[in-house]
C-alpha cells in the first residue's frame, strides 16, 4: 500500500460514526449524523397532504431537500436563495430516490414526508451521510405515527445507507475524507439496502480510468461499509 491515509485508518475502515437522536424539538424525526468531521442535521417532517398527481390514490410521497450552511466549509459559501446549484439539485434528488426505495408509499397513506438534510460541517461524504442519517430520521418519524395510532405498522421495507469509495494510486479506500476525496482518481458513491442490494451507484473517473476488476473491489468495499453502517443505524434506533 503506497498511499497512507491522513488519519491513519485502514483502507476498509469507516470514519467514526455517531447518530444523536431527537436533536431538534419540533420535527417528527431528527438526528445529527456524524461521519468523521462531516456533520449533517437530518429531519423528517410529515404533512397530511400529497402532490396533486397523487390525490385520491391512497398513496403517500417522500421528497428531500439538501443545503449546506455557508460556514460548513473552510471558505464561506453564499447561501443558495433564488436558484439552487446543479450540485444541490442532484444531491437532493439522490437522497429522495434512495429513501423512497425503502418505504411502502401505499401503506403510508395520503401523507407527505420531507427529509431535510442541512450540512453543518463538510469533510467529504455529505450526500452519503445525508442518506444514512435521513433513513434514521425517517424511521423515528414513522415510529411516532405508530405510537400515536395513525399507522398500524411501519411502512419501512428495509434499511438504507450510503458510503463513498475511491481509488487512490490504484487502491480502493472506504469512506473518503476531504484530502482523500481531492486526491482520488476515481470516486464512487454507493447506496445499498440492509440486505446489500444496490439502490444507486455513482462513479466517475478524473484523469484516469478503472478496470472491471477494480469496480468489483469498489463494490466489495462498499458492502463492508454499508453492513457496518446499517448495524450502527439499528443500534441507534433501538435506543429511541
Curated annotation (Swiss-Prot):
GO annotation (BP), single: rRNA processing
Keywords: Nucleotidyltransferase, RNA-binding, rRNA processing, Transferase, tRNA processing, tRNA-binding
Superkingdom classification of source: Bacteria
Binding site residues for phosphate: 87, 125-127
The UniProt record lists the keyword Glycosyltransferase: no
CDD domains: RNase_PH_bact
Cited Pfam families: RNase_PH, RNase_PH_C
EC main group: transferase
InterPro entries recorded: ExoRNase_PH_dom1, ExoRNase_PH_dom2, ExoRNase_PH_dom2_sf, PNPase/RNase_PH_dom_sf, Ribosomal_Su5_D2-typ_SF, RNase_PH, RNase_PH_bac-type, RNase_PH_CS
EC number: 2.7.7.56
Gene3D superfamilies xrefs: GHMP Kinase, N-terminal domain
Transmembrane segments: none
Any one GO molecular-function label of the UniProt entry: tRNA binding
Catalysed reactions, semicolon-separated: tRNA(n+1) + phosphate = tRNA(n) + a ribonucleoside 5'-diphosphate
NCBIfam families: RNasePH
Family: Belongs to the RNase PH family.
Function: Phosphorolytic 3'-5' exoribonuclease that plays an important role in tRNA 3'-end maturation. Removes nucleotide residues following the 3'-CCA terminus of tRNAs; can also add nucleotides to the ends of RNA molecules by using nucleoside diphosphates as substrates, but this may not be physiologically important. Probably plays a role in initiation of 16S rRNA degradation (leading to ribosome degradation) during starvation.
Subunit description: Homohexameric ring arranged as a trimer of dimers.
Protein known as: Ribonuclease PH
Species for this entry: Crocosphaera subtropica (strain ATCC 51142 / BH68) (Cyanothece sp. (strain ATCC 51142))
Gene: rph
Amino acid at each position: 500500500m503506497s498511499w497512507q491515509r491522513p488519519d491513519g485508518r485502514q483502507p476498509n475502515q469507516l470514519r467514526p460514526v455517531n447518530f444523536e437522536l431527537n436533536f431538534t424539538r419540533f420535527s417528527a424525526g431528527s438526528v445529527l449524523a456524524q461521519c468523521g468531521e462531516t456533520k449533517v442535521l437530518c429531519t423528517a417532517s410529515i404533512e397530511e397532504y400529497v402532490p396533486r398527481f397523487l390525490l385520491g390514490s391512497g398513496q403517500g410521497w417522500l421528497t428531500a431537500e439538501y443545503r449546506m450552511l455557508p460556514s460548513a466549509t473552510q471558505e464561506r459559501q453564499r447561501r443558495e436563495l433564488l436558484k439552487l446549484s446543479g450540485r444541490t439539485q442532484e444531491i437532493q434528488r439522490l437522497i429522495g430516490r434512495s429513501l423512497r426505495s425503502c418505504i411502502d408509499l401505499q401503506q403510508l397513506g395520503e401523507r407527505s414526508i420531507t427529509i431535510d438534510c442541512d450540512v453543518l460541517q463538510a469533510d467529504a461524504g455529505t450526500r452519503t451521510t445525508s442518506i444514512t442519517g435521513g433513513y434514521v430520521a425517517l424511521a423515528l418519524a414513522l415510529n411516532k405515527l405508530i405510537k400515536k395510532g395513525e399507522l398500524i405498522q411501519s411502512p419501512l421495507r428495509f434499511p438504507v445507507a450510503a458510503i463513498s469509495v475511491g481509488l487512490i494510486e490504484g487502491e480502493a479506500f472506504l469512506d473518503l475524507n476531504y484530502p482523500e476525496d481531492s486526491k482520488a482518481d476515481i470516486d464512487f458513491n454507493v447506496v445499498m439496502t440492509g440486505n446489500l442490494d444496490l439502490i444507486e451507484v455513482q462513479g466517475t473517473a478524473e484523469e484516469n480510468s478503472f478496470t472491471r476488476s477494480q469496480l468489483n473491489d469498489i463494490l466489495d468495499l462498499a458492502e463492508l461499509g454499508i453492513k457496518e453502517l446499517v448495524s450502527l443505524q439499528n443500534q441507534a434506533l433501538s435506543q429511541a
